[in-house]
Structure formats: structure tokens, C-alpha cells
Amino acid sequence: MEPVTKWSPKQVVDWTRGLDDCLQPYVHKFEREKIDGEQLLKISHQDLEELGVTRIGHQELVLEAVDLLCALNYGLETDTMKNLVLKLRASSHNLQNYISSRRKSPAYDGNTSRKPPNEFLTSVVELIGAAKALLAWLDRAPFTGITDLSVTKNKIIQLCLDLTTAVQKDCLIAEMEDKVLNVVKVLNGICDKTMRSTTDPVMSQCACLEEVHLPNVRPGEGLGMYIKSTYDGLHVITGTTENSPADRSQKIHAGDEVIQVNRQTVVGWQLKNLVRKLRENPTGVVLLLKKRPTGSFSFTPAPLKNLRWKPPLVQTSPPPTTTQSPESTMDASLKKEKPAILDLYIPPPPAVPYSPRDENVSFGYRGHSKSKQPLPVRKGSESPNSFLDQESQRRRFTIADSDQLPGYSVETNVLPTKMRGKTPSYGKPRPLSMPADGNWMGIVDPFAKPRGNGRKGEDALCRYFSNERITPITEESASPMYRFSRPLTERHLVRGADYIRGSRCYINSDLHSSATIPFQEEGSKKKSASSSAKASSGEPSLLVSWLTRLKLLTH
């Protein structure tokens, strides 16, 4: 690469054409004055005023771009991670020494709220500039993969924010200087710790320039590079697309900085001007890249793939354990050597409650649909939520679909019964009871006999699968398998469980017009046999007396 100090006036004009759009009206003034490369690197605010660049904002944009050229021209062979840390430490020491010497002066008055002197502000600006130069290295590969350096980077950013806030805050000079001294002391400690703890040779290696040729680019294929522009005009490659010209070259890595495109320096340019320069020659591109040292971090290219969100697969059974053959071990080692894929943000499913898309079947609980057609199943992945659609179709069915279920063992497949939630009729006299099925009584009574396979267990499961639709409890015929006997006068009652009172009971089939009768064991019923017999014998006599009175009234 030709040094910037050797640029001709034409090269300076070509470089200024890629700067911000607001600076384009001044290009002809650079061309008129025939400013060369050496004059460009030494340009100042006063020189820009003479050129006709009167706006302060426009002057700052030009000077920032020139600073990048100065760093490229003078600091390429000297800038290392170690030197940048030392520069930051020296800047913090200079600011600390300035404040200490200023406080020793007899004319020092820290109880005033005047603006700090220019020397103080200049030292602060130099410190922040040194921190920015170090952060530019820490924010790029291979240093982003080191945990300790990532923590150091975050601390330096926070300290720089605290420093700028303290300087701009309207307060006493002594108070402001105390805050600045605290920040400076922490920065000194970070620099010392970084120098002591880091022994990798990459800290002492400088960046280098490498020229990359991308020939034979097919029309419409593209180069396959992902470029991110920083706020100050640096263009950093973040990754490459797999099997693209950039990926096939094996020379373009994430973290590389684009310096030239087709022999034209693009440092400080707008990103759109850089892209236009890349598309200038459709058959091929020549890039000049600035590469950070790799050292012992084994940094490899990082291709990017176009990934879509896919739901996690549900593993129904554990995979069979097989011994690895030498061929499979070799394939695994080859896969490890492939470039790692950069982490992409893959959007998760929507956070709102998901409602499956279905045009033919309605899964709502409003109507009493008796349709017995099999549920439709989608084929393929129509959307990221197609997995949720299929899952909802497996889970949702109405009571009318219970006849379609295949036979299975109730003991092994039925989930534990849970108490129903509060319903609108909660608290009314009508008791909330469960049906008189052996399956449900087996949960209430741990000594009950297990039920066998049959349709009755399936009906019970499907009838009470949902808390929202519970069919009327029907009377169940007496069976000799029941452990508990009932009196003759209570044959119209069915056996159930009262979850309100926490006991078992006999329930009439019509829950709306019956009361709950406490269930008693056989032993306890023997004691009350005489009382129940008296009550049963007393009922006919009471009826006869009422009939006799009715006859007397009719006469």
C-alpha cells in the first residue's frame, strides 16, 4: 500500500468523493487548491476555514476521517494490544498528575463552579481517545472470544461514560475533580491488571495488511460478505456466506477491516459509497484488508447461513447406543475443523397465546358438535408455528370424540385425577361430586381393586377429561364386584366422592334436586340398622294418616 503522505492531489480528491453527502459541495475546493496527501494529514480547523468549510460540524467530519488516515499511515506497524493499553495508562497518569499539581497551586480554589481550564479538558479528551483506540481492538475478533477481555471492555466503556458525565455536570470544581480522580484510579488498576495477567504473544503482535482477489464472480451471485460500518467510518467484516466467493477464498475472516477496494482507499467513507465501489467491477474485486493478530487463539473464518426458526424436536424415545466406528470418529473430527457459524438472532415463537390455524374444523367449546371425522393433519412446515398447530390438534378433542379413541389400559395411561376448579355454581347447595366409576374410586380409596381394560374406563376418562364440559352423572347398575353394599331403599343412589366435605357419599342421579347422603361403611351401618328400619316403617303410617285426612275433607 502506498503511504498517504505520497498521495497526489487527484488521489485526495478521489478519497473525498466517498465521504458524507454533506461534504460533497467542498470537493471542488480541495481540487482547486491541489491539496496532496501530506497536506491532508496536517490539515486543521484554520485550513478548513480558508478552504470555505465554515460549518463546525462539517469541519469535524473531515477531521475525523483524516484522523483515520493518520492512524492507518503512522500506527499500522506500531499499534499492538500492549501498546494501546500502555497509551491508555499513560493518558490516565497524565490527567491524574495534572489534577494533583493544580491542587498544589496557591491560587487553586475548588469551591467555585467555574468551567475547568482548557488544559484539563484536553487531558480528558486524550484519555477518551486512548480508550477508544483500545476498545476498537477489544471489540473485534479474536479478542471478543476472551471472557476476561470482554469484561475489561465493558468496564472501560462504563468508566468513559462516567468521566464524560462528571466533566459536563454543573458542580463545584473540587467535586468534579474528585469524580475524575476516582475514574482515573480505576482505569490505572485495569491497565496494570491487564498487563500482568495477559501473557499471550498476541498482545505484542501488530496488525498487517493482506490483499485478497475475488475473481470470476457470477452475475447476480454477490461477494457474500457482511460488512458493518462503525460510527467513525471504519468498515469491519462480520462474516461470510457459505460457498460464496468470499468464503471460497479462505482469506476473509470476521473482524477484518476493509482498507481499499480496487486500489481505492475507503477509510472514512460512507457504507453506501463502499458498496457502490464493490459493485463497480462485476467480474471481480481486489480487496486490501487489515487483519488483527490471531496468535494462539486459533481463529477461523466464520461463515453465515440463512437460518429459519425451527421448533425443537420432541424426542419420544432415547436413541440406541452404538459404538463409534473409526469412520464416524473421523467424520466428527472433520466437522470440528469446519468454520464455526456466527450466532444469529433467531426470533422465538410469539409470546401471545397461540391460536392454531384451521379452516375446516372448529375446536371451540361453544357448540355440541357430533362430528366423528378424523382430525386433519398438515403436511410440511407451513410456518414456524406449524409444530404448535399439530400439537394442538393432538391435544384438543370434544366429548363427542370419545368413541373414536382406541382401547388402552386405564391403569398405565390415565393421569392422576385433579380436583375441578371453581365454577360459576361454586358455593351453591348442589354438591360437586365425581362419578361412581371404579377408576375414580380407586383414587379415593387406596384399597380398591384395580379396574381392567374396557370401554367403561375409556368413557370415564373422556367424559371428565375437561373441566369445562361435564356430562350429567348417570346411574350405574349394581355389581357384585363392589366392596360396599347399600340398603334396599337407596338403590336409586350412586356412589361418589364429596370433595367439599372431604368424604365419600351416595349421590342421587339428579344432582339438582337431591342432597348428599354421607356414605357409611358396613360396620357403621350395622349400628344404625334399627333406626333405618324404624324410619322406613314409619313412612307408610304417615302416608296413611294423610290419605285419611284427605278423605275426611272430601266428605
From Swiss-Prot:
Main localization, broad class: cytoplasm
Start and end residues of each stretch annotated as Disordered: 308-333, 362-389, 518-538
Coiled-coil stretches noted in the UniProt entry, renumbered to this chain: none
Gene3D superfamilies documented for this protein: 2.30.42.10, Transcription Factor, Ets-1
Keywords noted in UniProt: Cell membrane, Cytoplasm, Membrane, Phosphoprotein
Domain DUF1170: 325-546
Domain CRIC: 80-174
Similarity field: Belongs to the CNKSR family.
Protein's name according to its UniProt entry: Connector enhancer of kinase suppressor of ras 3
